[in-house]
A protein has these predicted regions:
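Short loop/turn motifs that initiate or flank beta-strands
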Residues: 1-213
Length: 213
């Protein structure tokens, strides 16, 4: 452009490949000049050199896993990316470090340089990893127990043992559950809503009875 003159540009051109790269030749397509501080009639796109650089698109990743008592956040627990294009998908390898081991959403992560994007239906080279957070969900507890026949379907907390706790952690539990029959035999604990878990050597907020066996 001459001096400080400027023009507007509208329309769409095309490049031979959608992938990241520098100085890709642009076919003009419907690209057209329009007046700004200069007159479009004084210029032409024909015969010029037209290039486009395609840069990596930054992605924010969310990982998700159950509580396991550690701050390790593996790329294999990927839940979602925020900005994949055209229905593409990617995976991740490696691991980072969560700021907390406890249950929460959107926990910040460090050591993200140890995480790597991996090709899926899209190319990892077209993207860069901008930030990563992890959602740590409650660990599902299982329960079992035994009691002596007492003609009712109640199962007291003292009759019930909790399992699937993280190694070295314990919880207190209280209340009453319900079993399928008052008679002697093996039954599923059908209703645990009356059982409450509480902190001991572990945090009750990191666990749930819902969905367990």
């Amino acid at each position: 452009l001459v001096g400080s003159e400027t023009l507007n540009l509208s329309g769409t051109g095309t490049i031979a490949s959608k992938n990241v790269g520098s100085n890709k030749t642009v076919s003009l397509g419907t690209l057209a000049l329009a007046d700004d501080t200069g007159l479009a009639a004084n210029y032409t796109l024909s015969g010029g050199t037209h290039q486009l650089t395609v840069n990596q698109r930054p992605l924010n990743a969310t990982l998700s896993r159950q509580y396991d008592g550690t701050t390790t956040a593996a790329g294999s627990t990927l839940s979602s990316f925020d900005a994949l294009q055209g229905g593409e998908n990617l995976t991740m390898t490696g691991s980072g470090t969560a700021a907390s081991a406890n249950v929460a959403n959107g926990i910040a992560m460090s050591n993200n340089g140890n995480l790597a994007l991996v090709d899926g239906t899209g190319l990892a080279s077209n993207y860069s990893l901008n930030s990563t957070v992890i959602n740590i969900t409650q660990r599902v507890l299982n329960s079992s127990g035994s009691k002596t026949y007492d003609a009712n379907t109640n199962a007291l907390a003292a009759d019930i043992t909790l399992s699937n706790l993280v190694s070295g952690e314990t919880l207190n539990h209280s209340g009453t559950a319900t079993i399928g029959s008052a008679n002697a035999g093996s039954y599923t604990i059908s209703n645990l809503t009356g059982i409450t878990i509480a902190d001991n050597a572990g945090l009750a907020s990191n666990y749930t009875l819902t969905g367990g066996t």
